[in-house]
Amino acid sequence: MASIDRFQVMQEPELKILEHWFENEDTRRRMDGMLLLDEWYARVNKDKHDTVIMAYDGQLPAGMVVIEFGEERTYIGLIVNPLYRLKGYGKQILQKLMTEPDFTSVREWVACIEEDNRISLACFQAAGFTLEDTEPDEDGFLTLILRN
């Protein structure tokens, strides 16, 4: 059973974990905007509006969450460890993160997911997100929102 027991701000050595996850073809294809990982990490790490968090099941990394805080909306992205996919970890990560004290003040969470990424769409919907519009944007992304 999926169990997330802690979150921690991602540290540079954990990029090795992400490199391993990016060996998965689906991860690489869907998240190619994060490549090269070291350059991506340097950029988000210095932006005060971005936070990257690792989610752990015991000592095992279950997923990574990227959060971009905006004035009205907070954007969220999720990568689940490829070995943990389709086991409820994504939903568990999202639901547990929303109850963390650092994030309970967020009024509106937004996720932009490719229209053909049915697994991610189902994951975010299972965690309480709803479609903002039934049609994708010009880049083929659907926007899902969760209001607190």
From Swiss-Prot:
One of its GO terms (molecular function) is acyltransferase activity, transferring groups other than amino-acyl groups. Its EC number is 2.3.1.-. Keywords: Acyltransferase, Transferase. It is an enzyme of class 2 (transferase). It holds the Pfam family Acetyltransf_1. It comes from the Bacteria. Residues 8-148 form the N-acetyltransferase domain. Belongs to the acetyltransferase family. This is Uncharacterized N-acetyltransferase YfmK. It comes from Bacillus subtilis (strain 168).
